[in-house]
């Protein structure tokens, strides 16, 4: 094999690591799993790392920035009815840019935080009066994932009807599971309802309840809780509205009401290395299901065509990804020449081409999710800097390239007899994770950390 063929082979093998345009950047994402790096200017210059959330991290979530609010309020997502909860937006901003650490409670590192919005209707809540019921569809949680922490967050406003006895005896809040088939409800929390000077979110730890629900072999897909208020002596019930609780937004069903609904925040740890491509496939399945034509293709042909149009857009993006990954080798000769006439230069200019190309180093690679057609389900970031490795690995190899012994021997043989062995390849030697906030196939907002997303250093292998 001559030097030109060897270089072309290396470039083909590494095409997923060194794409040339926005669509080819999907090869990098497919090989790893993405996470966000949000910057106020939208430049995507840096990576984002996630910290496993402890109680302090959840409480420290900041108010979402203007760009996040505009994106949340828009209709650019795959499902226009999904309004990202402010808490999840704030959580992303709070955790972005921090290195992953162990969870504060000693449970270990978590890599996924999912926000499940309350799905209880006003009628179901009225049936629980004087309490309030909450219903969450947790079926999208993978059985292979370990639930590390679960927290129920309920909005409590300043009470319009202050309890006159609150100065002496504080009423109590009782949180329990919904009655099971035998009519048994399990009390989870009992605590005093402190007086409020303004609105705030009441947080309840429901980790044990969620874990028990998942262990039950015939568990419902819905996780149900009931919040009640009683007098200090727990002898008689109180209306939750007197303490500032109640149906969000007056039951108008608007965007404000959706953002004020109760939220079940579950932190989990995956047992296997996650790939972003798994989520992409789930998104594609959800898109196909949403775009299925009606049984009667009569007058509805127009709407079917519109649905297929959206479906075609996603297919085009994914097809472009596959095409870029596959054609990267075909363009590898010419693409490799971008560094100085390498792969496509042919055998005649072999020596000159090698001298003209730069040594193995890290190069810029900007990933724009809009170009990939993923901006309808990815909330943040809209873009990020992934970097890629490019250049020649010639003898003698520099120590900062951290070559393996095999790469050293192979490079030495190649320098002595190019036809005996190809040159070693410039590849990522060290990668770091980033995080991504997105809407999953079940329309839940998920904060997830993906490994091996940003090239930190390049080496010869």
Swiss-Prot record:
One of its GO terms (biological process) is forebrain morphogenesis. SMART domains: TGFB (SM00204). GO terms for molecular function: cytokine activity; growth factor activity; identical protein binding. Disulfide bonds join 360-426, 389-458, 393-460. The keyword Signal applies. Residues 20-315 form a propeptide. Residues 351-360 have a biased composition (Basic residues). Residues 1-19 form the signal peptide. Residues 287-360 are annotated as: Disordered. Residues 323-350 have a biased composition (Gly residues). The keyword Ribosomal protein does not apply. Keywords: Cleavage on pair of basic residues, Cytokine, Disulfide bond, Glycoprotein, Growth factor, Secreted, Signal. It is found in: Secreted. GO terms for cellular component: extracellular region; extracellular space. Glycans are attached at residue 79. Homodimer; disulfide-linked. PANTHER family: GROWTH_DIFFERENTIATION FACTOR 7, TGF-BETA FAMILY. Belongs to the TGF-beta family. This is Growth/differentiation factor 7. It comes from Mus musculus (Mouse). The gene is Gdf7.
